[in-house]
Swiss-Prot record:
It holds the Pfam family Asp_Glu_race. It comes from the Bacteria. One of its GO terms (biological process) is regulation of cell shape. Keywords: Cell shape, Cell wall biogenesis/degradation, Isomerase, Peptidoglycan synthesis. InterPro entries: Asp/Glu/hydantoin_racemase, Asp/Glu_race, Asp/Glu_racemase_AS_1, Glu_race. This is Glutamate racemase. Its EC number is 5.1.1.3. It comes from Roseobacter denitrificans (strain ATCC 33942 / OCh 114) (Erythrobacter sp. (strain OCh 114)). The active site is at 70 (proton donor/acceptor), 194 (proton donor/acceptor). Signal peptide: none annotated. Pathway: Cell wall biogenesis; peptidoglycan biosynthesis. The lineage of its organism: Bacteria, Pseudomonadati, Pseudomonadota, Alphaproteobacteria, Rhodobacterales.
């Protein structure tokens, strides 16, 4: 019984790497739905159906707790899953909760009225589906007032990263940052709202400038998971790490090894 980590592709490996560093003795089962990636251009219903299929596969593998290490799935499917699909003895958590907590400097269960926070102008870089869901804006509005969020749908970046074309990914990042800056010239902070994007964090930071605080999720999610498992020790897993993909295992293994710079072997899901 491992803790499951799900992503539409390989971006969730940034979260896996951080949680393995934070929780080195914890076994994880990682599932990449590479056959259907990217999710960011799909409809909300399609994302929901695909996410449920993959999470069910992790439940079948013995996971009682699954992390959606995919902002698109977290934004478009998580709430619906939690309300009507997840079994009572299982838990599914998303990745943007820790980010909202960090930005608003308050805990998720804090239901006090919205208040002013330190940042006023926030740039959001995410997939088209995440931007369309307005999930970040909605959750920020519940907790903070006076925050202007300008969203930039970053088409093509995930495809380039999944294909290993980092030169194209870098060019696309710079283009999307320039497009955002035409709408919001001087953001206080930037959200990398896709778990693929930390692989390009240095490029985002250079393009935005050193005065912009860039929020990247991996370490925030790792700390949040460690806290959650302390409060819910029954969800801690046992067993051996496993890597599963709906795509070609050899190809996905090579890409994952390139990303993490250590050998990762995927099997067919």
């Amino acid at each position: 019984m491992s803790v499951g980590i799900f992503d539409s592709g390989l971006g969730g490996l940034t979260v896996l790497d951080a949680v393995q560093t934070r929780l080195p003795d914890m076994p994880f089962a990682y599932l990449a739905d590479s056959a259907h990636a990217p999710y960011g251009v799909r409809t909300a219903d399609d994302i929901y159906d695909l996410t449920c299929q993959s999470v069910a596969r992790l439940f079948d593998a013995g996971c009682n707790l699954v992390i959606l290490a995919c902002n698109t799935a977290s934004a478009a499917a998580l709430r619906r899953m939690q309300e009507s699909w997840v079994p009572e003895d299982k838990r599914v958590l998303g990745v943007f909760v820790p980010l909202i907590e960090a930005m608003t400097e308050r805990q998720w269960g804090d239901n006090s009225p919205p208040r002013e926070v330190g940042v006023k102008h926030v740039a959001l870089f995410a997939t088209p589906a995440t931007v369309a869901s307005r999930a970040f804006q909605r959750e920020l509005a519940f907790r903070a007032i006076g925050v202007d969020v300008e969203a930039q749908a970053c088409g093509g970046v995930v495809d380039a990263i999944e294909d290993g074309d980092m030169m194209l990914a870098e060019a696309l990042v710079r283009s999307h940052v320039e497009a955002l800056q035409r709408k919001m010239p001087t953001p206080d902070a930037a959200i990398l709202g896709c778990t693929h994007y930390p692989l390009m964090q240095d490029i985002f930071q250079k393009a935005l400038g050193e005065n912009v605080r860039v929020f990247s999720q991996a370490n925030l999610v790792a700390d949040s998971l460690a806290d959650y498992l302390e409060r819910h020790p029954g969800m801690r897993g046992t067993g051996s790490p496993v890597f599963l993909t709906t795509g070609d295992p050899a190809r996905v293994s090579d890409r994952a090894t390139q990303f993490l710079r250590r050998r990762i072997e995927f099997s067919a899901a």
